[in-house]
Design a protein with these regions (language model features):
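Short, acidic, small-residue-rich periplasmic hinge/interaction motif at the N-terminus
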Residues: 34-38, 44-50, 79-83, 93-139, ...
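Short acidic/polar hinge/loop motifs at secondary-structure boundaries
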Residues: 139, 179-207, 296
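Extracytoplasmic beta-strand/coil segments of soluble accessory domains associated
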Residues: 145-182, 199
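A beta-strand signature from Gram-negative outer-membrane beta-barrel systems
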Residues: 152-153, 193-238
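Transmembrane beta-barrel wall of Gram-negative outer-membrane proteins
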Residues: 243-272, 282-322, 343-363, 428-431, ...
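Membrane-embedded beta-barrel scaffold of Gram-negative outer-membrane proteins
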Residues: 365-383, 526, 570-621, 625-628, ...
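Gram-negative outer-membrane beta-barrel transporters
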Residues: 494, 498, 597-601, 618-721
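C-terminal beta-signal and adjacent terminal beta-strands/loops
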Residues: 702, 713-721, 745-799
C-alpha cells in the first residue's frame, strides 16, 4: 500500500448529522483528533472557508467543537506536535451537526500535505435543500436581483414581476441572520433585501423541519448577510459605481471593521432605472424606478461561550406603473389615457438582536432573538386619468368581448408594524439531538382604499362624473398575533439511517383566527456508497398577514361601491399537506445529482389576482389546490475552479372555487352542483417546465480573481386563462429561451493593501434580446412583457 493511500485511510470520518440546530443559518462541527490511535490533547484544529477562519484546541480527550458555523463548504485542518497535518473538506449544513474524527500519524512526515473530502452519508442534504455561496452569487449574471437568484434553484419558478413561485403556489418564508422577516403578498415590488447585502443563502423547497411555520410555506429562504471574516484588525471597504442602458445607475459604499473580538459591517446602496416593472408594451411607458437602502450589522464575542449580533436595515423604493395607450395593441386590451402616471412608494425597516449562549461542552446552544419590522406602502393613482382607461367587460367575455367598460381608479395606503421574539434550546448527544423553540409575534396594521369611477354613483352607464366619482373609502385597523411552538429530534439509528421528526403548533389571531398541529417526519437512507434516498411528509399552517386582507366584495363586475354595513374580512389561513421522495447521487465529492418528486394538497389556498389594471396583488382563498412534479439539480465544482449546474423543474399546480375574500371576481367561480375537484384548473403561475443552466470559468493566475459566466433560461409558458375568468382564452403562451452573461474581477475583503486594481462586473441579461410575453390580460392578470437586452457595468475601488 502506498504512503498516500495509507494517509487517506488514516482519516476516520463519521460525519453524523444529528439535528436541526440553534440558528436558522448555522450548523455545528465536532470531532476527535487522535495521534497514532491515542487522543491528542492540545491539538490545533482550524475550520476555514467562506472567507471565515475558526480556531479550536482539543481537550484532554482530543475532542473539539465549533458551535456556530454558517452553512457552506469548509476545510477542517488538524495539527499536532510531531504528527503530519491532515485536511478534511466538509459541507456544513444549516440546522445540522457534523462530526469529523481525524486520525493523525507520526509516520507520514515525508508527505507534504494530505487533503480528503468527507462523504456526508445519511447526513447529506435532501435534493430539496440547496445553497448559493458567496462565490455563486458573485459570479452569477443575475446577482442584482434576489428573486432571480432564487429562480436558478430547483422547485422555483419565475413568475410575473420576478416573483418566485415555489412548489406551485405563492409564498416564501424569509429568515435573515437567524431572525424571521415576514413578507406580505399584496403590495411590495421591491425585494425584501438588496441582494448586494447577501453573503450566501439556503433554500428549502421541501424537507422543512418543525422550527419553520406559521407563514406561507411554499419554501424557506435562509439568508446570511455578513459572516465573521478572516481579516486583520482594522477598517476596510470599497466604493462601487456603475451604469447601463435603460438609464441604469448604481452606487454602493461598503465598509467592514475588526477591533478585538468585534466586527461591524455597513453598506449603503442606490440604484435607478427607466425599466422597473414588467410592462404591457415592448417599449415601456412610465416605468422608472429607484431604490435606496442602508444596512448595518454588528457582531461581538461577549464571553468565550456567548455572542451578540445586531442587524438594522432601512429601504426606500419608488416605482412608476407602466401603461398601454395603444387601442390596437394585440396583447393588451386595457387602454389608458396618454399621460396617466400612477406611482407606488415603499418604506421598509427591520432590526433584530441575536444573543447566543453555548454550553460548556459545545454541544448545547441557547438562543434568543427579539426582532422588529415596519412596512409602509402608498399607491398614488392618477384618478382623473385612471377612470378614462377602458378594458373588455370580462364578466360577459365570452360570448362577446367587444363590450368595454371604464376601469376603476385606485388610491391606497397601508402600514404594518411587527414585533416578535424567537427562542430555542438545542442539545446534541451521541445518536440523538433535540431542539425545542418558539416564535411569537404581534402585528398592527392600518390601511385605506379609495376607488374612483367614471360614472356617477359608480353605475355602469349614465351621467359622467367630473373628474371622477369617489366610490369607496374604507379605513382599516386591526391587530393580530401569531405563536408557534415546536419540538424536534434527529435520531441516527444506524450509520445508514437518519430519522428526522418533529411536531409544531401554530395559532393566529386577526381578522380570522385559526390554529393547527403540524407533524413533520423524514428519513435519509444511505446505501453505503453513492446514493442517499430521502422520504419526507409534513403539514404546514399559513396565516395571512393583516395587510393582505381586504374587505370581501365583488366590485369590478357591478361597478358599485362595497357595502359599508358589517364589512366582511374573511381571508382564511391556509393548510398544506406535503410529501416528497428523492435521491442524491454523488459521482465524486465535487459532482452530485439530486432528483426529487413531490406532491402537495392545499385547503384555502392563499392565491392572488391583480387589482384592477394595476400590478398590485389582491389575495383571496381558493377552496382547494394541488401541486405535483419533479425537480432536478446537477452540479459540479471542477478541480481547476470552474463550476457548472443544470436545474430543471417539471410541475403542475391546480386550484378551484373561492372560499375567502371574494374580491374583484367577474364570474361566479363556484359553479352550483359541480364539485371543486371537478373544477380544478391550471394556476395562472403554473409553468410546466422551468430550467436554468450555467457555466462559470475562473482565470487570472493563482488567485483566479477573474470569472466569466454564461447562463441559459427556459420556460414552457404560462396559461392564459384561469378560474373561468375568460374562457375565450385557452392554452399557454409560447415557450421562451434567454441567455445571460457576466464577466468580472473579484476583490478580497481585508486585502486592500495587497490587491492592487479595480473590481469589475459586467452583466448582460437577455443577451439575444428575446422579448417574450409573460402574461396577457384575462381578468386575473395584466399583460406583462419581458425586458429586452440590458447591461450593467460596475467598477469597485478598495480602500
Amino acid at each position: 500500500m502506498s504512503r498516500l493511500t495509507t494517509a487517506f485511510a488514516a482519516v476516520l470520518l463519521a460525519l453524523s448529522v444529528i439535528t436541526p440546530v440553534f440558528a436558522a443559518t448555522t450548523g455545528l462541527v465536532r470531532g476527535t483528533i487522535t495521534v497514532d490511535g491515542k487522543p491528542a490533547a492540545g491539538a490545533t484544529v482550524l475550520l476555514e472557508g467562506q472567507g471565515s477562519l475558526f480556531k479550536a484546541t482539543t481537550n484532554s480527550q482530543g475532542v473539539y467543537v465549533f458551535s456556530l458555523v454558517p452553512f457552506g463548504s469548509y476545510r477542517v485542518i488538524a495539527r499536532a506536535n510531531g504528527a503530519h497535518e491532515l485536511q478534511v473538506i466538509v459541507n456544513v449544513i444549516s440546522g445540522h451537526v457534523s462530526t469529523v474524527d481525524v486520525a493523525l500519524s507520526t509516520q507520514l512526515k515525508q508527505i507534504a500535505q494530505t487533503t480528503v473530502t468527507a462523504h456526508a452519508g445519511a447526513e447529506a442534504n435532501p435534493a430539496s435543500v440547496n445553497t448559493l455561496t458567496r462565490t455563486d452569487i458573485q459570479t452569477s449574471p443575475v446577482n442584482n436581483s434576489l428573486n432571480r437568484l432564487l429562480e436558478t434553484l430547483p422547485g422555483v419558478v419565475q413568475f410575473s414581476y420576478n416573483e418566485p413561485v415555489i412548489n406551485g403556489f405563492h409564498g416564501v418564508t424569509y429568515n435573515i441572520d437567524g431572525a424571521p422577516l415576514p413578507l406580505a403578498t399584496t403590495s411590495n415590488f421591491a425585494e425584501i433585501i438588496d441582494p448586494k447585502l447577501i453573503n450566501s443563502l439556503e433554500v428549502l423547497t421541501g424537507a422543512i423541519p418543525a422550527e419553520y411555520g406559521g407563514d406561507r410555506m411554499g419554501g424557506v429562504v435562509n439568508i446570511i448577510s455578513n459572516r465573521p471574516t478572516d481579516i486583520p484588525q482594522g477598517t476596510y471597504g470599497s466604493i462601487t459605481g456603475g451604469f447601463g442602458n435603460q438609464a441604469q445607475g448604481i452606487g454602493s459604499f461598503d465598509v467592514e471593521s475588526r477591533t478585538g473580538l468585534s466586527e461591524f459591517f455597513l453598506s449603503a446602496n442606490m440604484q435607478t432605472t427607466d425599466r422597473g416593472l414588467d410592462a404591457p408594451t415592448y417599449t415601456p411607458i412610465n416605468d422608472a424606478a429607484s431604490n435606496n437602502d442602508q444596512f448595518f450589522r454588528f457582531i461581538t464575542q461577549l464571553t468565550p461561550r456567548s455572542t451578540l449580533a445586531f442587524d438594522y436595515s432601512n429601504q426606500f423604493s419608488q416605482f412608476q406603473i407602466p401603461i398601454n395607450t395603444d387601442p390596437n395593441n394585440p396583447l393588451d386590451p386595457i387602454v389608458s389615457a396618454p399621460g396617466t402616471l400612477d406611482t407606488q412608494l415603499e418604506y421598509e425597516r427591520f432590526s433584530n438582536l441575536n444573543w447566543t449562549q453555548v454550553s460548556q461542552d459545545g454541544n448545547g446552544v441557547f438562543q434568543l432573538i427579539p426582532w422588529w419590522r415596519s412596512t409602509r406602502i402608498d399607491y398614488y393613482g392618477d384618478l382623473p386619468l385612471d377612470v378614462l382607461a377602458v378594458e373588455p367587460d370580462f364578466s360577459v367575455c365570452p360570448p362577446t368581448c367587444d363590450k368595454t367598460i371604464h376601469v376603476v381608479g385606485l388610491n391606497q395606503g397601508s402600514y404594518a408594524s411587527y414585533i416578535g421574539l424567537r427562542g430555542s434550546d438545542f442539545r446534541a448527544t451521541k445518536n440523538h439531538a433535540w431542539k425545542v423553540g418558539f416564535d411569537v409575534s404581534r402585528e398592527n396594521a392600518t390601511a385605506y382604499q379609495e376607488f374612483a369611477c367614471y360614472y356617477v354613483n359608480c353605475a355602469a352607464s349614465g351621467p359622467v362624473a367630473t373628474p371622477f366619482f369617489p366610490a369607496y373609502t374604507t379605513p382599516q385597523g386591526q391587530a393580530g398575533s401569531q405563536i408557534g411552538i415546536y419540538a424536534e429530534d434527529r435520531w441516527q439509528e444506524t450509520p445508514n439511517i437518519l430519522w428526522s421528526y418533529g411536531l409544531r403548533y401554530d395559532a393566529s389571531t386577526g381578522y380570522v383566527s385559526g390554529n393547527q398541529i403540524s407533524p413533520r417526519i423524514g428519513v435519509n437512507l444511505w446505501d453505503g456508497g453513492k446514493n442517499v434516498a430521502h422520504i419526507y411528509y409534513g403539514r404546514f399552517y399559513a396565516a395571512p398577514l393583516l395587510e393582505d386582507v381586504r374587505q370581501a366584495c365583488v366590485l369590478l363586475s357591478a361597478q358599485q361601491a362595497c357595502s359599508t354595513t358589517n364589512p366582511v374580512y374573511d381571508l382564511k389561513p391556509e393548510s398544506d399537506a406535503y410529501l416528497e421522495m428523492g435521491d442524491v447521487y454523488t459521482f465524486n465529492p465535487r459532482f452530485t445529482l439530486g432528483i426529487n418528486i413531490f406532491e402537495k394538497s392545499v385547503v384555502n389556498v392563499l392565491d392572488t389576482t391583480q387589482l384592477f389594471n394595476t400590478p398590485i396583488f389582491a389575495v383571496y382563498n381558493n377552496s382547494i389546490g394541488i401541486n405535483h412534479g419533479a425537480e432536478l439539480r446537477l452540479q459540479e465544482q471542477e478541480p481547476g475552479g470552474d463550476q457548472w449546474f443544470l436545474t430543471t423543474t417539471y410541475s403542475g399546480s391546480y386550484a378551484a372555487c373561492i372560499s375567502g375574500s371574494e374580491f374583484l371576481f367577474p364570474p361566479n367561480t363556484n359553479q352550483p352542483g359541480v364539485s371543486c375537484v371537478a373544477q380544478l384548473s391550471l394556476e395562472d403561475h403554473s409553468q410546466t417546465v422551468d430550467s436554468t443552466a450555467a457555466y462559470t470559468h475562473r482565470f487570472g493566475g493563482g488567485p483566479q480573481l477573474w470569472y466569466a459566466t454564461l447562463q441559459g433560461n427556459y420556460g414552457s409558458g404560462f396559461p392564459v386563462q384561469f378560474e373561468d375568468a375568460n374562457i375565450n382564452l385557452n392554452g399557454t403562451l409560447p415557450a421562451h429561451t434567454t441567455l445571460d452573461f457576466s464577466l468580472g474581477r473579484n476583490l478580497t475583503p481585508g486585502k486592500s493593501g495587497e490587491d492592487q486594481g479595480l473590481g469589475l462586473s459586467l452583466q448582460v441579461l437577455n443577451l439575444l434580446n428575446h422579448q417574450y410575453v409573460i402574461k396577457v390580460a384575462n381578468g386575473f392578470n395584466t399583460t406583462q412583457i419581458a425586458n429586452g437586452r440590458n447591461f450593467l457595468l460596475r467598477l469597485t475601488a478598495p480602500f
